[in-house]
């Protein structure tokens, strides 16, 4: 048996402490290093930085459980990336529109930063958690060089009847 170097994209000096493969998507890897998080979509052939809002800090352990990625850090406590479903659906730089499969949702009556659609929305307060949105949140991928400037999403019931139409047109 022989060793294969799978550190392409992780800088020299970013000593890797932990590597975990996703429990559902083969070849989706997460690496915790001295200089933060990295992700590989191809079994470790190429790594990309994956910090999101996580400060650059040593990552000491990773655990994938209940569809979440839990990150243990050196001096910054634990971080949790909720719902790996979006990452599992990501397919790289696509040239066409793609609607990602939404997670199951519950209709409720509570306040959430995710309920607002305003140009002035600056995100949630750092000192507060965020309640889930009321209803379904749709995520989609739209290529930068798309010729279509308008999007229309039709939501249908189980019989194919349109129950709601959402458009990007003002």
Q: Where are the model-predicted features located?
A:
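Beta-strand-rich binding/interaction modules
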Residues: 138-139, 146-166
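Solvent-exposed beta-strand/loop surfaces of large extracellular or lumenal domains
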Residues: 55-58, 161-170
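A short beta-strand motif that forms part of the nucleic acid-binding face
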Residues: 44, 157, 169
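Beta-propeller blade termini and top-face loops
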Residues: 1-126, 133-139
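Solvent-exposed loop and beta-edge segments used for protein-protein assembly and interaction
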Residues: 130-134, 145-147
């Amino acid at each position: 048996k022989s060793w294969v170097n799978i550190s392409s994209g992780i800088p020299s000096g970013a000593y890797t402490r932990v590597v975990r493969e996703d429990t559902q998507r083969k070849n989706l890897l997460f690496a915790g290093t001295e200089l933060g998080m990295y992700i590989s979509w191809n079994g470790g052939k190429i790594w990309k930085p994956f910090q999101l809002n996580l400060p650059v800090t040593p990552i000491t352990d990773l655990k994938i459980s209940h569809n979440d990625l839990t990150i243990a850090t050196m001096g910054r406590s634990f971080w949790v990336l909720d719902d790996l479903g979006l990452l599992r659906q990501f397919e790289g730089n696509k040239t066409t529109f793609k609607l990602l499969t939404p997670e199951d949702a519950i209709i409720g009556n509570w306040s959430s930063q995710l309920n607002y659609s305003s140009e002035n929305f600056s995100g949630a307060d750092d000192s507060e958690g965020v309640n889930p949105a009321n209803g379904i949140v749709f995520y989609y991928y739209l290529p930068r060089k798309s010729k279509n400037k308008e999007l229309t999403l039709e939501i249908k019931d189980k019989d194919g009847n349109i129950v709601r139409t959402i458009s990007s047109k003002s």
